[in-house]
């Protein structure tokens, strides 16, 4: 299934890379099941008025200002959370019960793509998991210029009956498979309500590690990476991080962004009513990550729109020592049909279709591809790249397509060069960014 964005950023960030671009930073995340089902459907022993509790939750979101917050069961009291929260970027609700998924994200950073995906399998064996279109969300979050993280929020099937276990494992594998298709080569965060425990051996929660190369923050920091075999249930609010809950966070970096978890905590004591009562039947979890840019590969911001299939040259480039572009080939006419680069070692990266007229430039041994101008526009109500112009270190250029009034120039940092691509394509180039490597 090809996702279509509900939110679009045509050209991320600055028009050109520069020496002042941020190269390191921190990210704090929070996952919280906010118990937002209608009161008649939810007897979870959370005292107090749900409207008041939801306003309190939103005020705590604003107070502690986590960078990325994934919420689950954000159904019929969603507006009250947003009423008191102050994060600048927030997903629009998909609706209350039975229309919505209950999944939303609040963030200090904008995103260039967002998609809601329904579970392919659900079960009512021990609950009403099929009552709403539960599933997961995907967004491509822009943290800084050339720094992107794919963020997944999820709420899997609950219960321990045979049908529940089958559905939940299907849910987990559905997300893992989606990551393998739509997040190839990218840094990834997955956090939310997994309804899974390592000590429940029928739960295949290890799929994110085995299939996607991700790490569980709690397992890494609180259990020294050792999968527990003895169940340790958490109180609510929890007084220890050693116990295991179903709310989890997974992460990985990529060839551009080094990502490392430095902190994990059950935030229960920060999310209490004024009388000390809990606000939800789940312990909220938080984690902190440090990030830094790689010294061997970096990327530009994106230009274009959220259509077509995802591609990335990063995995192939990560295994190369000092890659260099030797031949540039673009195809275009009314729009940009394809982009290709041949490296000095003979590797060829080609993306897009076969239409248009080809334009080729062969670089000298000491000549580098240092800048690329992209222009975009609308075709069939979809944003695509219409034009590319490459400029080398000697000032030579090659171009294809038709220029528009909406353009951005992506310039490699000083001492770096363009050696590959990442983005989305079909018969044409819908979205495009460039991979940089040292000269």
Predicted regions located by residue number:
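Metal-dependent phosphoester-hydrolase catalytic domains
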Residues: 180-188, 196-296
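Acidic/histidine-rich helix-loop elements
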Residues: 31-53, 119-131, 157-167
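Active-site beta-strand/loop signature of hydrolases that rely on acidic residues for catalysis
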Residues: 27-34, 57-79, 106, 139-141, ...
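Preference for well-ordered, secondary-structure-rich cores of eukaryotic proteins
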Residues: 46-56, 80-85, 96, 126, ...
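Structured beta-strand-rich core segments of catalytic domains in phosphoester-bond hydrolases
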Residues: 68-157, 264
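N-terminal, active-site-proximal structural segment of metallo-dependent hydrolase catalytic domains
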Residues: 2-10, 18-83, 290-294
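Lectin-type carbohydrate-recognition ectodomains
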Residues: 294-439
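Active-site-proximal segments of metal-dependent phosphoesterases and phosphodiesterases across multiple
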Residues: 156-175, 195-209
């Amino acid at each position: 299934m090809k996702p279509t964005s509900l939110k679009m950023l045509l050209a991320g960030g600055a028009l050109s890379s520069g020496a002042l671009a941020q190269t390191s930073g921190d990210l704090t995340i929070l996952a919280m099941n906010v118990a937002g089902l209608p009161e008649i459907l939810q007897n979870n022993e959370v005292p107090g008025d749900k409207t008041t509790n939801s306003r309190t939750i939103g005020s705590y979101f604003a107070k502690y200002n986590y960078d990325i917050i994934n919420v689950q069961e954000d159904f019929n009291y969603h507006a009250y959370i947003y009423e008191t929260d102050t994060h600048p970027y927030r997903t629009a609700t998909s609706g209350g019960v039975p229309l919505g998924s209950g999944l939303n994200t609040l963030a200090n950073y904008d995103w260039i793509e967002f998609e809601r995906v329904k579970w392919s399998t659900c079960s009512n064996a021990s609950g009403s998991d099929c009552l709403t279109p539960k599933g997961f969300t995907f967004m491509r979050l822009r943290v800084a210029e050339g720094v992107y993280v794919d963020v997944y929020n999820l709420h899997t099937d609950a219960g321990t009956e045979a049908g529940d276990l089958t559905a939940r494992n299907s849910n987990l594998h559905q997300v893992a498979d989606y990551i393998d298709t739509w997040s190839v080569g990218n840094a990834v965060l997955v956090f939310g309500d997994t309804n899974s425990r390592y000590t429940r051996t029928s739960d295949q929660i290890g799929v994110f590690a085995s299939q996607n190369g991700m790490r569980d923050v709690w397992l890494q920091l609180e259990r020294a990476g050792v999968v527990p075999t003895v169940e340790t249930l958490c109180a609510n609010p929890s007084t220890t991080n050693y116990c295991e809950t179903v709310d989890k966070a997974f992460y990985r970096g990529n060839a551009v962004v080094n990502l490392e978890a430095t902190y994990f905590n059950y935030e229960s004591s920060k999310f209490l009513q004024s009388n000390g009562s809990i606000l939800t039947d789940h312990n909220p979890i938080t984690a902190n990550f440090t990030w830094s840019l790689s010294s061997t590969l970096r990327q530009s911001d994106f230009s274009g729109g959220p259509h077509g299939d995802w591609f990335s040259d990063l995995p192939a480039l990560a295994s190369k020592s000092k890659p260099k572009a030797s031949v540039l080939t673009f195809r275009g006419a009314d729009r940009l049909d394809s982009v290709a680069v041949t490296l000095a070692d003979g590797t060829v990266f080609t993306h897009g279709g076969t239409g248009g007229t080809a334009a080729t430039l062969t670089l000298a041994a000491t000549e580098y591809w240092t800048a690329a101008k992209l222009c975009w526009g609308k075709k069939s109500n979809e944003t695509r790249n219409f034009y590319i112009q490459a400029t080398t270190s000697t000032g030579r250029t090659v171009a294809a397509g038709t220029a528009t009034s909406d353009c951005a120039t992506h310039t490699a940092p000083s001492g770096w060069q363009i050696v590959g691509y990442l983005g989305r394509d079909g018969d044409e180039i819908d979205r495009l960014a460039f991979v940089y490597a040292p000269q």
